[in-house]
A protein has these predicted regions:
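C-terminal catalytic histidine-bearing segment of alpha/beta-hydrolase fold enzymes
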Residues: 222, 226-229, 233-272
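Short, surface-exposed "cap/lid" segments of acyl-processing enzymes
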Residues: 57-90
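The feature captures the conserved acid-bearing segment of alpha/beta-hydrolase catalytic domains
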Residues: 158-159, 164-178, 190-227
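N-terminal cap/lid segment of alpha/beta-hydrolase-fold proteins
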Residues: 2, 6-59
Length: 272
């Protein structure tokens, strides 16, 4: 089998380019029309270590919690500015939502990107009140899963608040990615691909994990979605995987815009 094709989404998704073209436009429209937007807040000192904060009526203190979204794009593409509208569903449920950017490869190795996201999460732990929950899509699913691993340390406030992670179409074992043409840009070697794979790490207690993927995704993404909970359950973590019928790699994350979506429920509601 062709390893590049196994991890290729665009050519296998109907109207894929239409989705990708719509996201920045819909995001810009949302930013202009939404009153409770605080844009381009710094969490680090690099050019892309910024986030946008969207708060429901009553402001951050009235929110029932803070959800942070980490975008995908294979650690190579996209930014927070493509995903602002994804805050809509959780805002309607009373959550504040932070949408993050981070330094992309090849300017940063994946190890550095992980460090940036941990800095962002620690910063957000001091923002608002109530639970802190992380949502990541694709490469972002990898990054939020890494925040559960026991080599990532947060201060007491963030540790107390961070209670759930949702990895949507996430990549949890990076070793196969060494075989991809894109690895010219990532520069993953055996050491880094092992160290950066949540699958090969130990989960910290006290954080629930849901891995969610579309039933119409590429088989390799469905496999990556299933493997992390299978391994981490054996290490005592409260985690499970789900497939969402009728959804592919792009449509699944678009359900974040709808308050009644399964994705928003999994962020907001008690897990059975």
């Amino acid at each position: 089998a062709d390893p590049d094709d196994a991890y290729e989404n665009r050519i296998h998704i109907p109207n894929a380019d239409r989705h990708l073209a719509a996201w920045p436009k819909d995001a810009a429209t949302f930013r202009k029309s939404f009153a409770g937007a605080d844009l381009n807040l710094a969490y680090g000192s690099s050019k892309r270590t910024y986030y946008d904060l969207f708060t429901p009526q009553g402001g951050i203190e009235a929110a029932c919690g803070l959800a942070a979204f980490v975008h995908g794009g294979y650690w190579l593409a996209l930014s927070k500015d493509d995903f602002s509208h994804m805050a809509a569903g959780l805002l309607a449920r009373g959550w504040a939502v932070a949408i993050l950017s981070y330094t992309l490869a090849p300017q940063a190795r994946i190890t550095q990107i992980t460090r940036e996201i941990s800095t962002a999460v620690e910063h957000l732990g001091k923002t608002g009140t109530g639970p802190l929950r992380l949502i990541g899509h694709s490469a972002g699913g990898h990054l939020v899963s890494r925040m559960m691993c026991d080599d990532i340390n947060f201060g007491p406030v963030t540790t107390q608040r961070l209670d759930r992670v949702l990895s949507v179409s996430g990549l949890h074992d990076l070793r196969p990615l060494q075989r991809l043409a894109k690895n010219e840009l990532w520069q993953l070697d055996e050491n880094e691909s092992q160290a950066e794979s949540p699958l090969l790490r130990t989960p910290r207690p006290g954080i629930d994990l849901v891995c969610l993927a579309g039933a119409d995704e590429r088989p390799e993404f469905i496999r990556q979605n299933a493997i992390l909970p299978l391994v981490w359950q054996g290490l005592g973590a409260n985690c499970h995987s789900q497939l969402l019928a009728g959804h592919n790699h792009f449509t699944i994350i678009e359900t974040m815009t709808r308050a009644d979506s399964r994705l928003c429920e999994l962020v907001d509601c008690p897990l059975s």
